A protein has these predicted regions:
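Short, Lys/Arg-rich flexible segments
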Residues: 2-221
Length: 221
């Protein structure tokens, strides 16, 4: 018997597996005895709808907590709906630090760059590596803080390698502004509990839909 939904965390994110628990299976049993295909369809739709609900819930919660654009959080979410005869769906949330330019429109100021209420003093907005403008600061700047530039990578004239980013040579190391999403890590268990509760609500709705469809079909016979 299924143990219900659960989450598995790793260094760079968390995978939420959404699947029926004993409570959900109990709700399915009566219909499954009479209309097994209808019960399976109801379960599949309920899980997939709950995955969509959970994705929106997480995006809004993290966006509000970290003061970043919901669209930026959504880019870190990957949904894997129920397929075929499967009984579970999955939702991946990557929590590696996100580039500051992605959380909202960056704006140059007299003291540096600001984005969504975050101020990066001494920083500048420009293309250092790649085609996108990012927020950068020289490592030697008095305004540099490792907290504002987590998980930075280094690219030199010879190509990328781990470490700091070099603008034109290794003599001028630059750090890219990023926003840590590590604060989301403790919330995965809470999200799983919410998803389990929502799954039961949606499952009952889908079961009722299948029952009504069956009754209407019989009434026309």
């Amino acid at each position: 018997m299924s143990v219900g939904s659960y989450t598995k965390l790793s260094a760079d994110g968390g995978m939420i597996t959404l699947q029926p628990s004993a409570v959900h299976i109990q709700a399915l049993q009566d219909l499954a005895k009479v209309l097994p295909k209808a019960a399976a369809n109801a379960q599949r739709r309920a899980i997939n709808k709950t995955l969509g609900w959970l994705m929106t819930r997480i995006a809004r919660a993290v966006g509000s907590q970290e003061q970043i654009a919901i669209s930026a959080v959504r880019q870190r979410l990957r949904s894997y709906p129920v397929a075929g005869g499967g009984m579970s769906g999955k939702l991946w949330f990557g929590i590696n630090a996100i580039e500051a330019r992605r959380i909202g429109p960056p704006r140059k100021t007299g003291q540096g760059v600001s984005v969504k209420g975050r101020r990066y003093r001494g920083a500048f907005l420009g293309k250092v590596y790649g085609s996108k403008k990012d927020i950068w600061i020289r490592k030697a700047s008095k305004h540099f803080s490792a907290d504002d530039y987590p998980d930075s990578e280094l690219t030199s004239a010879r190509g990328p390698r781990s470490g700091w980013i070099a603008e034109h040579s290794d003599r001028h190391p630059l750090a890219k502004a990023k926003v840590s999403l590590e604060q989301a890590r403790p919330h995965f268990d809470h999200w799983v509990k919410q998803a389990d509760q929502q799954l039961l609500v949606v499952l009952r709705q889908e079961l009722n839909f299948e029952i009504q469809k069956y009754l209407k079909g019989n009434a026309r016979v």
